[in-house]
Amino acid sequence: MKKFNQSLLATAMLLAAGGANAAAFQLAEVSTSGLGRAYAGEAAIADNASVVATNPALMSLFKTAQFSTGGVYVDSRINMNGDVTSHATIITSSSGIKAIEGGSASARNVVPGAFVPNLYFVAPVNDKFALGAGMNVNFGLKSEYDDSYDAGIFGGKTDLSAINLNLSGAYRVTEGLSLGLGVNAVYAKAQVERNAGIIADSVKDNQVKTALTVQQEPLKFLDKYLPSKDTSVVSLQDRAAWGFGWNAGVMYQFNEANRIGLAYHSKVDIDFTDRTATSVEANVIKAGKKGDLTLTLPDYLELSGFHQLTDKLAVHYSYKYTHWSRLTKLNASFEDGKKAFDKELQYSNNSRVALGASYNLDEKLTLRAGIAYDQAASRHQRSAAIPDTDRTWYSLGATYKFTPNLSVDLGYAYLKGKKVHFKEVKTIGDERSLTLNTTANYTSQAHANLYGLNLNYSF
């Protein structure tokens, strides 16, 4: 277990964990051709160099070098509706619990639009062996609430990106069987900000102020630490963290019209460093010192099939399983070994199923369509910072060949998330004398429009 000078970092990374386009903070947008079929058949289809990101064994199907670059723009529309209340528990008061303040927890469009880039290259070495390299984003999220948001202790700003750099090789074992193996270096950035919100109003209450005067530091000066709603109470920023993993794949081609593929991507541990933390944990509300936390990006397995039914029509499908239960809890301790943080996450393993079809209209134009169902990972414990939900994908796409070597992929997907109701609770203070309990009740609604564009070139 890593040791900490402050418990902030564990708090921050708990909060930095979805959006309308992925379970928890996993992203599916590795290519535009895949977007057009709702990423059905990803481990079995080899229509461009993006196979580097899905199943490296598919590189054995290429006869010439392939290059692909582009990205997907994710236009999320996630709205939060609800209320937030702050209560003070004053042990020395005969009134016991008193409601101090109430406010709105509603906010619109809390996840801003984001561009998810990709870049791939595949080079056959001979009839049996091929090499590939790629850059894509498998995990990431961003959510933003106003600085003066009443439920700022739950909202604020969260920004996590993890750029995956991959080197892969593929080997054709027999005419039908191919194997692939790759190594991954993940470059990650994280920024988390939380604000006082309604807590700043609570500590201005005269009874609370009186109770604060007999507290130990730093609670004694809590009203001075939190002068306004936009006061930062949680802060983390790390712009350069690395993690490493591997991936493997197998592909079996029964004939040119039928193949199946299985791909596995290992977990990746990202070591974040917090150098100047701020925390509102009990008795810790000041700048912290250096601390570390390892966040695990989960491993996942995908099984896919591709079947060319006629000269023009093909169908494809996928089942993807992500091992989110690796993130059951976050633990941290101070340098002296005392517990700083122990939080249950209750993430659940999730499944994604997809079905798609491709139609070769003529030699230049290929059309695609797909549908998918993606299960939420945070089904038992949700967060305003991560408005995760079950979602359904509806996708359309096309590839147009300008020349035998140059083509462009276009893709669109509409994602509709289920309405979700949940509650978040935060307590600060000393339970022996004074605590401030903040509770927010939320209803979240999410949908998103995804637009993709990729250019492909065959040498």
Swiss-Prot record:
Q: Can you cite an annotated GO cellular component?
A: cell outer membrane
Q: Where in the cell is it found?
A: Cell outer membrane
Primary localization class, coarse: membrane
* Keyword field contains Transmembrane: yes
**Does Membrane count among this protein's keywords?**
yes
Q: How does it sit in the membrane?
A: Multi-pass membrane protein
The record's listing under InterPro entries reads:
OMPP1/FadL/TodX (IPR005017)
Give the SUPFAM superfamilies listed for this entry: Porins
Q: What is this protein called?
A: Outer membrane protein P1
- From what organism does this protein derive? Haemophilus influenzae (strain ATCC 51907 / DSM 11121 / KW20 / Rd)
The coding gene here is: ompP1
